[in-house]
Amino acid sequence: FGVFFAETEVRGRKFFAAKIIPAVGAWVEMETDADEAVYVRIDRKRKFPVSSLLRVFADMEKSPKTDEELVKMFTGPAATYVQNSLAKDHAKSADESYLEIYKRLRDSDLVNIALAREFMVSLFSRARYDLSTVGRLRLNSRFNSDPPLADAAVAAAASSVTTDEGRTLTLLDLAAIINQLATLNNTRDAVGDDIDHLG
């Protein structure tokens, strides 16, 4: 359980992806490619720009953010990746992001905002999503030991305690993972994790 980074090669260039594997709940995968944007798949469904997921998590955590505020959570290449993701995103608000994600996960165009919001809140609630204590510890130790983090807020998230609340995914976890993807993509000799040796 935790987050794992893997590399793929596209047209002779190496790109990294991340898998967030909980003990219980949906797998979240983030991938990057030549357009320097980050895309997300939840439970291997259709991908969408990571900016929609960032908006939804900010809203669920009762700290809604404008697109500019989302970009300011990042520095360097990670900020560029988020800006590029925003440019690819059809959704332009938290409500639209809930709807877009719901459509991709449920393969349905018949949805209202209340249903989409309820679905996402439930999907990542403690009752349906659990990183486990081990998963949270792995996530925290990875980002405590892998500089640089974008800002103090991301570093604070990486040192969260392993309470029941600490065993769910947070906006700052997503930010730390995006930062790591950008760092790996911009590090010449970076290599992915060997998942067989992480047990």
Predicted regions: what they are:
Residues 1-199:
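N-terminal non-catalytic structural scaffold regions of very large proteins
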